[in-house]
Amino acid sequence: MPRTLFDKIWDTHIVRPQTAETPAVLYIDLHLIHEVTSPQAFTELRRRGLKVRRPDRTLATMDHSTPTTPRGPDGIIPVVDAQAAAQLRQLEQNCADFGIPLFALGSERQGIVHVIGPEQGLTQPGMTIVCGDSHTSTHGAFGALAFGIGTSEVAHVLATQCLIQNRPKTMEVRVDGRLKPGVTAKDIILAIIARYGVGAGVGHVFEYTGEAIRALSMEERMTICNMSIEGGARAGMIAPDDTTFQYIAGRPFAPKGAAWDEAVAYWRTLPTDDGAVYDRTITLDASQLTPMITYGTNPGMGIPIDGRIPTPEELPDQAARQALDKALRYMDLRPGQPLLGQKVDVVFLGSCTNSRISDLRMAASVLKGRKIAEGVRMMVVPGSQQVKKQAEAEGLDRIFREAGAEWREAGCSACLGMNDDKVPPGKYAVSTSNRNFEGRQGPGARTLLASPLTAVASAIEGVVADPRKYVG
């Protein structure tokens, strides 16, 4: 019987099958942890006298609470927030006590958990991957089944290397056509969520297929899968291919020699079989897309960059009209208003959605030789120390600095308004991150989600700007 990519991975990881009364028990290949969602899990292990079942299949990094302030003269990244410092110390102690490898603050491998997994070669096709973070779906770009879990589940995986789960349904998200200049992977996923809604994927795993998806680089595929959760899905996946294998080859934790050949042979069996049936299929024509931007307080409130905010009369029901009214009151925007020309106070280039080297190259290519507008604060936060090192080797940091932007250390940063990486109350931020909820980037912050190209164009002009004028 033909099977989907999801079916193949799920079926090979079942420890105990799902029944009418009980969920399935799944084996977990890779467990990633960080300082925010793991402390209570370790407390539970100590309370029950349990060990970590597979410390060799567990990896920790510091990312959420880490300051991104440039290093001091001593080369140390200063941690001034007491709560952040306590979380970082606790993770360090927990990893030492339980024998878990840690990429600590200041180390050359530290970074956002969903950036370092792929760049180190830990993320591989066919794996089950979990982390106490909703954007674990990022790793699905490699043909892995990857999803976020809660703190109690973190404890369960630490103790057993297994997880209790109900089998989700499958949804094909087919994207055909070719992207036009100035339109990016970020615009694809924002368009999908805007068209189908933040609840479209509830109870499903997305598998992205089609000509436009196959043409994307691995880092672009990660951007797509990263925001699957914003579309309501449990996870997002893309079948592995030669692009995937070329990205993984030679990375520190990738298979070597004969093991590599065996791995690739297995990975080639994973793509969805001809004739396999998805529970649902939705489509998008990439050739018709323009740059996208959000206007409201959930990622589904998005419009083309040259569009207008919808009016209540255009919405299908009273609930949608009420949500629009509430969002626009928070954002201080009006129905029918265009966003082009809307004043911008902060631009954030970073997050697990868009902080990889290709994102920084894309932004720097537009910013080179230009200045950001007076009064705009632009924060550029690489996703990992490895990304930062590569960007500096290419001179990208100089381009950002000379334009007037801040070049910061690696971490989650302004995505969730940590430390001093916040958007002031009432101010507008064009952000390459994944969430625009009320207060997400700081109390009263007003977030407009967009691609790196749109973010940089807006930084240059000081207002929401169409990036297509800056690209060939």
Curated annotation (Swiss-Prot):
Cofactor: [4Fe-4S] cluster
Keyword set, alphabetical order: 4Fe-4S, Amino-acid biosynthesis, Branched-chain amino acid biosynthesis, Iron, Iron-sulfur, Leucine biosynthesis, Lyase, Metal-binding
Catalytic activity: (2R,3S)-3-isopropylmalate = (2S)-2-isopropylmalate
Gene3D superfamilies: Aconitase, domain 3
Record CDD domains: IPMI (cd01583)
One Pfam family per UniProt: Aconitase
Cofactor note: Binds 1 [4Fe-4S] cluster per subunit.
Gene name of the encoded protein: leuC
Record's protein name: 3-isopropylmalate dehydratase large subunit
Family to which the UniProt record says this protein belongs: Belongs to the aconitase/IPM isomerase family. LeuC type 1 subfamily.
EC number: 4.2.1.33
Lineage: Bacteria, Bacillati, Chloroflexota, Chloroflexia, Chloroflexales
GO biological process annotation, one example: L-leucine biosynthetic process
